[in-house]
Amino acid sequence: MARYLGPKLKLSRREGTDLFLKSGVRAIDTKCKIEQAPGQHGARKPRLSDYGVQLREKQKVRRMYGVLERQFRNYYKEAARLKGNTGENLLALLEGRLDNVVYRMGFGATRAEARQLVSHKAIMVNGRVVNIASYQVKANDVVSIREKAKKQSRVKAALELAEQREKPTWLEVDAGKMEGTFKRQPERSDLSADINEHLIVELYSK
Protein backbone atom coordinates (compact mmCIF):
# COMPACT_ATOMS: atom_id res chain seq x y z
CA MET A 1 0.00 0.00 0.00
CA ALA A 2 1.43 3.37 -1.04
CA ARG A 3 1.76 6.25 1.39
CA TYR A 4 -1.12 8.75 1.18
CA LEU A 5 -0.05 11.98 -0.51
CA GLY A 6 -3.39 13.79 -0.72
CA PRO A 7 -4.83 16.58 1.45
CA LYS A 8 -4.03 15.98 5.12
CA LEU A 9 -7.21 17.61 6.39
CA LYS A 10 -9.30 15.13 4.43
CA LEU A 11 -7.88 12.29 6.52
CA SER A 12 -8.71 14.07 9.76
CA ARG A 13 -12.25 14.75 8.55
CA ARG A 14 -12.63 11.12 7.55
CA GLU A 15 -11.67 10.01 11.05
CA GLY A 16 -13.67 12.77 12.72
CA THR A 17 -10.75 13.97 14.84
CA ASP A 18 -7.60 16.06 14.48
CA LEU A 19 -4.76 13.66 13.61
CA PHE A 20 -2.20 16.50 13.87
CA LEU A 21 -1.02 15.83 10.32
CA LYS A 22 -1.20 19.46 9.23
CA SER A 23 0.05 21.26 12.30
CA GLY A 24 2.00 20.02 15.25
CA VAL A 25 0.42 22.49 17.66
CA ARG A 26 -2.87 24.18 16.87
CA ALA A 27 -6.04 22.28 16.32
CA ILE A 28 -7.39 22.17 12.80
CA ASP A 29 -8.70 25.51 11.59
CA THR A 30 -12.32 26.11 12.50
CA LYS A 31 -13.08 26.55 8.79
CA CYS A 32 -12.46 22.84 8.42
CA LYS A 33 -15.61 21.07 9.63
CA ILE A 34 -13.88 18.23 11.40
CA GLU A 35 -17.12 16.47 12.27
CA GLN A 36 -18.19 16.51 8.62
CA ALA A 37 -17.00 13.76 6.29
CA PRO A 38 -15.03 14.69 3.12
CA GLY A 39 -17.06 15.88 0.15
CA GLN A 40 -18.81 19.06 -0.94
CA HIS A 41 -21.53 18.70 1.64
CA GLY A 42 -20.07 15.93 3.74
CA ALA A 43 -21.31 12.42 3.17
CA ARG A 44 -23.78 11.17 5.72
CA LYS A 45 -21.98 8.83 8.08
CA PRO A 46 -23.61 5.40 8.14
CA ARG A 47 -24.12 3.64 11.42
CA LEU A 48 -21.06 1.45 11.80
CA SER A 49 -21.03 -2.19 12.83
CA ASP A 50 -18.71 -3.31 15.62
CA TYR A 51 -16.21 -4.30 12.94
CA GLY A 52 -16.57 -0.90 11.30
CA VAL A 53 -15.88 0.90 14.58
CA GLN A 54 -12.80 -1.25 15.18
CA LEU A 55 -11.56 -0.67 11.64
CA ARG A 56 -12.01 3.10 11.91
CA GLU A 57 -10.02 3.18 15.16
CA LYS A 58 -7.20 1.20 13.59
CA GLN A 59 -7.15 3.52 10.57
CA LYS A 60 -7.15 6.57 12.83
CA VAL A 61 -4.15 5.42 14.85
CA ARG A 62 -2.30 4.15 11.79
CA ARG A 63 -2.71 7.49 10.04
CA MET A 64 -1.85 9.44 13.17
CA TYR A 65 1.56 7.76 13.35
CA GLY A 66 2.03 7.65 9.57
CA VAL A 67 2.44 3.87 9.42
CA LEU A 68 1.52 1.70 6.44
CA GLU A 69 -0.90 -1.22 6.83
CA ARG A 70 1.70 -3.99 6.71
CA GLN A 71 3.93 -2.16 9.18
CA PHE A 72 1.01 -1.61 11.52
CA ARG A 73 0.04 -5.28 11.46
CA ASN A 74 3.65 -6.23 12.21
CA TYR A 75 3.66 -3.85 15.17
CA TYR A 76 0.54 -5.58 16.47
CA LYS A 77 2.13 -9.02 16.11
CA GLU A 78 5.19 -7.85 18.01
CA ALA A 79 3.02 -6.23 20.69
CA ALA A 80 1.12 -9.50 21.11
CA ARG A 81 4.38 -11.40 21.64
CA LEU A 82 5.56 -9.05 24.37
CA LYS A 83 4.58 -9.46 28.01
CA GLY A 84 1.83 -7.24 29.34
CA ASN A 85 -1.16 -5.53 27.75
CA THR A 86 -1.11 -5.94 23.96
CA GLY A 87 -2.80 -2.60 23.27
CA GLU A 88 -0.44 -0.68 25.52
CA ASN A 89 2.53 -2.53 24.02
CA LEU A 90 1.34 -1.46 20.57
CA LEU A 91 1.21 2.21 21.55
CA ALA A 92 4.64 1.95 23.18
CA LEU A 93 6.12 0.55 19.95
CA LEU A 94 4.55 3.34 17.90
CA GLU A 95 5.76 5.97 20.35
CA GLY A 96 9.26 4.48 20.24
CA ARG A 97 9.63 5.04 16.49
CA LEU A 98 12.43 7.49 15.77
CA ASP A 99 10.27 9.76 13.63
CA ASN A 100 7.71 9.98 16.44
CA VAL A 101 10.38 10.71 19.06
CA VAL A 102 11.81 13.47 16.85
CA TYR A 103 8.30 14.93 16.61
CA ARG A 104 7.63 14.59 20.34
CA MET A 105 10.93 16.32 21.12
CA GLY A 106 9.82 19.26 18.99
CA PHE A 107 12.39 18.97 16.20
CA GLY A 108 9.65 18.49 13.60
CA ALA A 109 6.32 20.36 13.48
CA THR A 110 4.52 17.18 12.39
CA ARG A 111 5.39 13.51 12.31
CA ALA A 112 5.70 13.74 8.52
CA GLU A 113 8.25 16.55 8.84
CA ALA A 114 10.10 14.58 11.52
CA ARG A 115 10.16 11.54 9.20
CA GLN A 116 11.68 13.70 6.48
CA LEU A 117 14.40 14.92 8.84
CA VAL A 118 15.25 11.31 9.64
CA SER A 119 15.34 10.20 6.00
CA HIS A 120 17.50 13.21 5.08
CA LYS A 121 20.09 12.10 7.65
CA ALA A 122 19.58 15.13 9.88
CA ILE A 123 19.07 13.04 13.05
CA MET A 124 21.58 11.25 15.26
CA VAL A 125 21.01 8.66 17.98
CA ASN A 126 23.80 8.41 20.53
CA GLY A 127 26.09 10.34 18.20
CA ARG A 128 25.47 8.17 15.13
CA VAL A 129 23.35 9.12 12.12
CA VAL A 130 20.18 7.04 11.81
CA ASN A 131 18.00 7.48 8.74
CA ILE A 132 15.40 4.78 9.42
CA ALA A 133 12.10 6.29 10.60
CA SER A 134 10.96 3.03 12.22
CA TYR A 135 14.15 2.68 14.30
CA GLN A 136 13.12 1.86 17.87
CA VAL A 137 14.54 4.35 20.36
CA LYS A 138 15.46 2.77 23.69
CA ALA A 139 15.57 4.10 27.25
CA ASN A 140 18.38 6.63 27.80
CA ASP A 141 19.10 7.00 24.07
CA VAL A 142 20.11 10.55 23.15
CA VAL A 143 18.49 11.94 19.99
CA SER A 144 19.99 15.06 18.44
CA ILE A 145 20.04 17.24 15.34
CA ARG A 146 23.18 17.04 13.21
CA GLU A 147 25.28 20.19 13.31
CA LYS A 148 24.71 21.05 9.66
CA ALA A 149 20.94 20.74 10.08
CA LYS A 150 20.67 22.96 13.17
CA LYS A 151 20.44 26.09 11.02
CA GLN A 152 17.42 24.85 9.09
CA SER A 153 14.55 27.28 9.51
CA ARG A 154 11.99 24.48 9.76
CA VAL A 155 13.79 23.00 12.77
CA LYS A 156 13.88 26.37 14.52
CA ALA A 157 10.22 26.97 13.68
CA ALA A 158 9.26 23.53 14.99
CA LEU A 159 11.05 24.17 18.29
CA GLU A 160 9.18 27.45 18.69
CA LEU A 161 5.87 25.68 18.05
CA ALA A 162 6.81 22.93 20.50
CA GLU A 163 6.98 25.52 23.27
CA GLN A 164 3.19 25.74 23.00
CA ARG A 165 2.74 21.98 23.39
CA GLU A 166 2.61 20.04 26.61
CA LYS A 167 6.06 18.61 27.38
CA PRO A 168 6.12 14.78 27.34
CA THR A 169 7.22 13.56 30.77
CA TRP A 170 9.10 10.58 29.33
CA LEU A 171 11.45 12.85 27.37
CA GLU A 172 14.06 15.37 28.45
CA VAL A 173 14.82 18.00 25.83
CA ASP A 174 17.50 20.69 25.66
CA ALA A 175 16.16 23.00 22.96
CA GLY A 176 19.35 25.08 22.98
CA LYS A 177 21.53 22.08 22.16
CA MET A 178 18.80 20.61 19.95
CA GLU A 179 19.03 17.24 21.64
CA GLY A 180 16.92 15.16 23.95
CA THR A 181 16.95 11.98 26.01
CA PHE A 182 14.35 9.23 25.74
CA LYS A 183 14.13 8.58 29.47
CA ARG A 184 11.61 5.76 29.35
CA GLN A 185 8.74 4.31 27.40
CA PRO A 186 5.56 6.31 27.96
CA GLU A 187 2.90 4.81 30.19
CA ARG A 188 -0.68 4.59 28.96
CA SER A 189 -1.70 7.48 31.21
CA ASP A 190 0.88 9.67 29.43
CA LEU A 191 -0.81 9.29 26.06
CA SER A 192 -3.97 10.59 24.44
CA ALA A 193 -7.23 9.33 25.88
CA ASP A 194 -8.70 9.79 22.39
CA ILE A 195 -7.12 6.48 21.34
CA ASN A 196 -9.02 3.27 22.11
CA GLU A 197 -6.38 0.60 21.58
CA HIS A 198 -8.75 -2.10 22.85
CA LEU A 199 -10.75 -1.79 19.63
CA ILE A 200 -7.60 -2.46 17.60
CA VAL A 201 -6.81 -5.55 19.67
CA GLU A 202 -10.37 -6.80 19.14
CA LEU A 203 -10.03 -6.23 15.38
CA TYR A 204 -6.81 -8.19 15.01
CA SER A 205 -7.86 -10.91 17.45
CA LYS A 206 -10.59 -12.15 15.11
Curated annotation (Swiss-Prot):
PROSITE patterns per UniProt: RIBOSOMAL_S4, S4
Origin superkingdom: Bacteria
Keywords of the record: Ribonucleoprotein, Ribosomal protein, RNA-binding, rRNA-binding
Residues covered by the S4 RNA-binding domain: 96-156
Disulphide bridges, residue numbers: none
Gene3D superfamilies for this protein: Ribosomal Protein S4 Delta 41, Chain A, domain 1 (1.10.1050.10), RNA-binding S4 domain (3.10.290.10)
GO MF annotation, one: rRNA binding
Family label: Belongs to the universal ribosomal protein uS4 family.
Protein name as it appears in the record: Small ribosomal subunit protein uS4
Source organism of the structure: Klebsiella pneumoniae subsp. pneumoniae (strain ATCC 700721 / MGH 78578)
